Amino acid sequence: MIGRLRGIILEKQPPQVLLETHGVGYEVFMPMTCFYALPETGQEAVIFTHFVVREDAQLLFGFIHKQERVLFRELIKVNGVGPKLALAILSGMSAQQFISAVERQEINALVKLPGVGKKTAERLVVEMKDRFKGLSGDLFVPQGAGEIPAAIDAPAMPADPEGEAVAALVALGYKPQEASRMVSKVASAGSDCEMLIRDALRAAL
């Protein structure tokens, strides 16, 4: 099992990053709350990973902190929650925000996440609220970690930041029309792809 990677970032296309380690490029899916914390292309990064093997694919999911991986692994234990939905959940909320929402049984906040309906939100609360008591130490994330930052430094603007932002939101589980509406709502001159995704996810909560 691949549990940790250290390498050079070759490409960043949210929610996926291509990391080169010893001449091998690994495609890693990351929650947007982790993606924002990555260094720029060409720089070194360390990512904690969870390896998923399916009949039709082998997928790597990556996290900046071990605690975020612990929460991801707890999420995919919930009935009806697979890796892609867990990725979307942790893209819409930081680990601490999600834990707080579950502990406070904030169903209305949870249903705003992509792919989460009322039944799934209720199931998340019922199945996960008691797990946090035994995992409080493992799930503790240092203050500021995993939170959506106020600003993102990006040296280069993609040719179509709005299009890339919409594609990233669709990959996270939003319907194309909804993703387009979310991006249009927060679009402004000078915004890059990551800024648009960040602001769209913020506005959705």
From Swiss-Prot:
Organism taxonomic ancestry: Bacteria, Pseudomonadati, Pseudomonadota, Gammaproteobacteria, Enterobacterales
Predominant location: cytoplasm
Protein name: Holliday junction branch migration complex subunit RuvA
Function of the protein: The RuvA-RuvB-RuvC complex processes Holliday junction (HJ) DNA during genetic recombination and DNA repair, while the RuvA-RuvB complex plays an important role in the rescue of blocked DNA replication forks via replication fork reversal (RFR). RuvA specifically binds to HJ cruciform DNA, conferring on it an open structure. The RuvB hexamer acts as an ATP-dependent pump, pulling dsDNA into and through the RuvAB complex. HJ branch migration allows RuvC to scan DNA until it finds its consensus sequence, where it cleaves and resolves the cruciform DNA.
Subunit and interaction comment: Homotetramer. Forms an RuvA(8)-RuvB(12)-Holliday junction (HJ) complex. HJ DNA is sandwiched between 2 RuvA tetramers; dsDNA enters through RuvA and exits via RuvB. An RuvB hexamer assembles on each DNA strand where it exits the tetramer. Each RuvB hexamer is contacted by two RuvA subunits (via domain III) on 2 adjacent RuvB subunits; this complex drives branch migration. In the full resolvosome a probable DNA-RuvA(4)-RuvB(12)-RuvC(2) complex forms which resolves the HJ.
A Pfam match: RuvA_C
A biological-process GO annotation: DNA recombination
Listed Gene3D superfamilies: 5' to 3' exonuclease, C-terminal subdomain (1.10.150.20), DNA helicase RuvA subunit, C-terminal domain (1.10.8.10), Nucleic acid-binding proteins (2.40.50.140)
Record's comment describing the protein's domains: Has three domains with a flexible linker between the domains II and III and assumes an 'L' shape. Domain III is highly mobile and contacts RuvB.
Region named Flexible linker: 144-156
Family label: Belongs to the RuvA family.
UniProt GO MF annotations: ATP binding; four-way junction DNA binding; four-way junction helicase activity
Keyword Cytoplasm: yes
Gene that produces this protein: ruvA
Region described as Domain II: 65-143
Annotated stretches, region: Domain III: 157-205
Region feature (Domain I): 1-64
UniProt keyword annotations, A-Z: Cytoplasm, DNA damage, DNA recombination, DNA repair, DNA-binding
